[in-house]
Amino acid sequence: MLRNLLWATSKHDVYLTQNYSVMHWSSMLRKSREVLNVARPVVPTLNSPGSMAQTVSRVQISTMTVKDNLMVAGGFQGEVMCKYLNQPGVAFCTKVATDENAITNSVDVYNNPSGAMRVITANNDAQVRVLDGGNFKCLNRFTFPWSVNNISASPDGKLLAVLGDSPECLLADAQSGKVVSNLKGHLDYSFASAWHPDGNILATGNQDTTCRLWDVRNLSESVQVLKGRMGAIRAIRFTSDGRFMAMAEPADFVHVFDTKSDYAAGQEIDLFGEIAGISFSPDADALFVGVSDRTYGSLLEFNRRSYDSYLNCIF
């Protein structure tokens, strides 16, 4: 599991997976409700000419993201589902890959330089697919030398960070798929990436238990190496203001760093259980951690401490 099964759209609204469902949790009402059930057949409501849309069922969700009211989820059999949170039904669903090991490892939603919304998927078949965010037609398909575990678009929509079963991480042009830079430094396979909101810093998480920070203005080597406690770095998130960065290990540990201190100041959150995902609220005041452990399954909320002067604790 690649640990991206949780997304906060506000300080009070969190979307997370539970069995064959995506649930919405309201921290204000202290209630949860089901917004998507994939145990039953899911029929797309949009089916424009040339669309790849098809019915899917019993989807085991492998990854998820939410942006601008659009939720995109991927499945273990190559499924992709797109649902507008303010509309009934699922707008689009299909199997983008049909290989035996075609898991959808990563999905992202971004706006290209002209402002058009794009949905991007990364699969174990070594392909990255770019879909139109309006009609969900496939616009581009990029092939890489290895299974792609994670993909993320830069804030300006011009670059894609492509990570997978290789120690090297790639930066590719989002329009053409052409590799523009090869990032070397990690020792094992990579699983996570995130862009600082200013677009200059890319963070990559690896099975070598480190997160490396790269400055896109000088990619000759990483500018920082942040170490985890004992496991691979499986998820990375920045706050919307860029002040904090969080990274999660497969289980038990989430690390929060203060970017203003050049990542020197931080806090380690020690918990019990497998980590399903991490997400900051858009206002940067809350950090949510999903725990998928059978015994300790839960959703944890950490609130940012506010003081007149900076003290030791961040969250």
How would you describe each model-predicted region?
Residues 184, 194, 200-315:
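Structured C-terminal portions of repeat-based eukaryotic scaffold domains
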Residues 165, 179, 206-207:
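Active-site cradle of extracellular carbohydrate-active enzymes
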